[in-house]
Amino acid sequence: MSEEPAAKKMKPTGWEDHTLNVSEAVMKADEGRFLTELAGEDVPVLQGIGPKSDIVLEALGVKTFEDLATYKYFLLARAIVTLAETETEGGRPDSSCMNIDNAVDKKFETKSLKEISEAPTSALQGLSEKARALLDELHVKTVKDLADFKYCRYAEAIIQASKYEEDKTDSERKAEAAMKRLA
């Protein structure tokens, strides 16, 4: 008597017809995992983060998906670049007191958001020369490069999407609903 194929032995989960995937973001072995599981992982689970990138990111204090998704300078760079899209040349009212002086080095305080976007990452206040050099190794040279850094964006998206993931199979959800009706 032969064994049934593994696919026939598997119980239905309720996700068999789903087609969403993040196959270009994570390693092959991790493609079928829950987003919530990925969210708790270290960054080498991301496709393209090899040993060198991992060492560089760890030197920046970034070890996990959460660290990468919430990296202070990534979020700041993304805010600057996003707001630069709304900026009108010469559109600042004379009475405006709007500023990001606590986010950028002194020589960039009077610059437009578009100019800051194109500035080197060293324009961001508090980013050390060592950190800037490490970012350079990852080919992140400008504030815009940092805002667009795909690994930060992937980690951020996985963290955010994981908040909406159903982690119970169909049968588990049905059993839970039945238990609620009995209570």
Residue ranges and their predicted role:
Residues 2-183:
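C-terminal extensions
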